């Protein structure tokens, strides 16, 4: 007596494998597109905030956050006008007495940055975007105007913008496209994170970028 044997033919198996391959390829392509979009957003943050910073200086002859004329102009909290944006990029919770928080309020009131309030914005990966003076709260005359070599936080002197919690691939691509791809030199520098939104170390030292798939970095750029 003959029995019917049920199973998949080689053609059917081949079709299934092709479909699986197409699905996996689409997923990987989609993931790469998402990564590229994040890189573009991070670069846009750096370039946009830099343009807003210099535009504010040109218009008001003062640093946002440090502007001693902000109250007369908008009713905002004044800075002390000493030429230094006091505080750290990851100040939290933000208060108007912190110049690194008033920085955002001044830029928003002036129309150079969208939104309202004093809180730092978040980047494309939900890390903090903030500013601080690389050399710390040093009188302007004492700040050495150098880009390379040993400096203040992040290896910089002067106002810098930092963006935290960046996946290694995003951080490396951002530094490569904007600067020299070297973590410890140039106008963009990175710090390997061990915690979210970390404090920026005194100098950008240590090993090179490492794309492990798990590393995260805080990138800072001299404005």
Q: Which sequence ranges carry the predicted segments?
A:
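Periplasmic/extracellular, small/polar-rich flexible segments of pilin-like filament-forming proteins
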Residues: 59-223
């Amino acid at each position: 007596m003959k029995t019917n044997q049920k199973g998949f033919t080689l053609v059917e198996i081949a079709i299934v494998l092709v479909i699986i391959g197409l699905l996996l390829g689409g997923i990987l392509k989609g993931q790469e597109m998402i990564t590229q979009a994040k890189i573009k957003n991070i670069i846009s943050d750096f370039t946009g905030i830099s343009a807003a910073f210099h535009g504010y200086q040109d218009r008001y002859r003062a640093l946002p956050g440090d502007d001693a004329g902000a109250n007369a102009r908008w009713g905002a909290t004044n800075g002390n006008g000493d030429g230094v944006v006091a505080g750290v990029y990851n100040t939290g919770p933000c208060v108007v007495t912190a110049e690194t928080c008033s920085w955002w309020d001044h830029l928003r009131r002036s129309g150079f940055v969208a939104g309202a309030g004093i809180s730092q914005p978040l980047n494309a990966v939900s890390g903090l975007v903030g500013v601080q003076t690389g050399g710390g709260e040093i009188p302007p005359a004492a700040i050495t105007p150098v880009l390379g070599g040993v400096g203040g936080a992040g290896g910089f002197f002067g106002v810098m913008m930092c963006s935290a919690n960046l996946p290694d691939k995003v951080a490396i691509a951002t530094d490569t496209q904007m600067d020299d791809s070297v973590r410890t030199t140039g106008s963009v520098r990175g710090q390997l994170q061990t915690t979210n939104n970390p404090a920026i170390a005194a100098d950008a030292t240590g090993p090179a970028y490492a794309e492990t798939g798990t590393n995260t970095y805080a990138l800072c750029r001299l404005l």
